Regions:
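Divalent metal-binding segments
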Residues: 3-9, 14, 18-256
Length: 256
């Protein structure tokens, strides 16, 4: 008989099995479930080295199967400044400055989850707003849906799009009446020139289009990218995801 390495008991287990939708205990050996049932059924699988956890009535679910993920970009995103809940210049400016100071060699400071109404209801975010927050380092803010980004003046200049650029249908570098970019960039092709300023060179999102790095990454870059992927997987596991569907990729990512 195989003894359990782990037993969880006194739980409310949702089995997803129509024949037995609920149970109160389960046993694990190695990385596999070996039994699901009630306390009396599972107790006999305990050995002297079995870890026994009293769930105290808490719910236990099967691992979640995630349906659509971009793991490399998501792992990279864990390093970025999160702006969820940030409103107005008074809140934004100190966060951006601290982020810049903590990343002195980064070619582009990227912030995630920026509110479309960051500077107030109905007020379109512009490069001038971002220049007030941080004028001396390239900055780009991404909306939560990743369909819009906003960049400050120095970022637009270095990306070569301050005077605008031709874009595919559906993508736009939004222009002001004076013929200069406002800072609003609609869809990925519009903000891709700014993303290219990243110190990483954008290896983390090449898989969106199945592209490979133009120059083979060196050992240090590979180690950094492997760490990024590992951090992404650990983040998923911490929230109960045991399987994911990675919706982008290339041979470089596959090799990692």
């Amino acid at each position: 008989m195989t003894l359990a390495d782990l037993i969880i008991e006194n739980a409310s287990i949702l089995t997803m099995d129509t024949a037995r939708p609920r149970a109160t205990a389960l046993a694990v050996a190695g990385n596999r479930l070996i039994a699901v049932g009630d306390g009396a059924d599972i107790a006999g699988l305990a050995g002297p080295d079995t870890l026994r956890i009293n769930a105290q009535g808490c719910t236990v679910l099967p691992g979640f199967i995630e349906a659509h993920m971009h793991l490399f970009w998501g792992g990279y995103g864990l390093k970025l400044l999160q702006l969820s809940g940030v409103q107005g210049l008074a809140q934004l400016a100190p966060k951006l400055r601290a982020y810049a100071d903590a990343n002195p060699t980064e070619g582009l400071l990227i912030c995630k989850a920026a509110d479309y109404n960051l500077f107030g209801p109905g007020i379109a975010t512009t490069r001038q707003h971002l220049d007030q927050a941080l004028p001396d380092r390239p900055v780009m803010l991404l909306s939560s849906d990743h369909h819009t980004a906003w960049a400050n003046t120095i970022a637009l200049e270095r990306a070569g799009i301050l005077q605008g650029a031709d874009m595919p249908v559906g993508c736009e570098v939004v222009m002001a009446p004076d013929g200069m970019a406002t800072g609003e960039l609609r869809e990925q092709f519009a903000y891709a020139p700014v993303l290219a300023l990243r110190t990483s060179g954008g290896r983390e999102d090449l898989g969106f289009a199945g592209q490979e790095p133009a120059t083979p990454p060196n050992a240090a870059e590979r180690a950094e990218d492997l760490h990024t992927l590992s951090q992404g997987l650990q983040y998923c596991a911490a929230f109960g995801f045991t399987s994911i569907h990675n919706m982008d990729g290339n041979f470089y990512q596959l090799a990692l």
